[in-house]
């Protein structure tokens, strides 16, 4: 074979080898880029899936009550023994909301129950409390609410019902006077949360000052777990 032809053949083989190497390198870079992109997308999706009411690393448990599956963060449970998954007859939670004086954070105890086990406070107002009201009326409470003490003869010693007299679906809460010096007055409010589910709220009487914000803030908070 002539020397010139051998040189051309050798040069062509070198070019082919160089092209092959470049193609392999490009394929490797594309593969690595794809892996990196997959990790980035997975991290972003995990961040997007994290509900806004809990931290990234906080575990949420699935509890079923009143026909609803709820995703509840561990930190919401009031009692450690309820931190298990599955069906429940009652779920006790404790939340913190800015419902105190001047919007200070206040603890709100929430007990979730099947709707059939309780009556809402608005129903008790006409069906029970109205018949136990004393003649006197308290005007020392929050603006917009009327306070009516309950007759102690029926077991309502030291209890007052605070309600909005102008609404067809009024805010109603029953509060009991402090049982000891230095203790706070405590209130209860029961509401229906839709088909199959109800909630009993327990809170300090100072929260009544933000009674107009109470239900909207509670519903927004509970919506985060699927209610």
Where are these regions (language model features)?
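A mature extracytoplasmic/lumenal domain signature
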Residues: 76, 177-179, 203-205
């Amino acid at each position: 074979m002539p020397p010139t032809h051998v040189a051309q053949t050798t040069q062509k083989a070198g070019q082919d080898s160089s092209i092959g190497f470049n193609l392999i390198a490009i394929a490797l870079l594309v593969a690595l880029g794809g892996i990196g992109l997959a990790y980035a997308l997975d991290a972003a999706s995990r961040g997007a899936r994290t509900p806004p009411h809990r931290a990234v690393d906080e575990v949420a448990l699935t509890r079923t009550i009143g026909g609803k599956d709820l995703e509840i963060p561990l930190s919401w449970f009031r009692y450690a023994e309820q931190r298990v998954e599955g069906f429940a007859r009652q779920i006790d939670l404790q939340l913190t909301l800015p419902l105190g004086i001047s919007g200070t954070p206040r603890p709100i105890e929430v007990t979730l129950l099947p709707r059939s086990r309780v009556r809402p406070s608005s129903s008790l107002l006409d069906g029970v409390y109205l018949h136990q009201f004393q003649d006197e009326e308290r005007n020392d409470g929050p603006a917009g609410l009327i306070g009516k003490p309950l007759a102690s003869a029926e077991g309502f010693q030291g209890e007052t019902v605070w309600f909005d007299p102008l609404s067809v679906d009024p805010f109603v809460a029953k509060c009991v006077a402090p049982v000891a010096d230095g203790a706070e007055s405590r209130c209860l409010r029961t509401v229906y949360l839709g088909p199959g589910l109800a909630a009993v709220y327990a809170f300090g009487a100072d929260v009544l000052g933000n009674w107009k914000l109470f239900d909207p803030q509670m519903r927004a908070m509970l919506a985060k777990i699927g209610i």
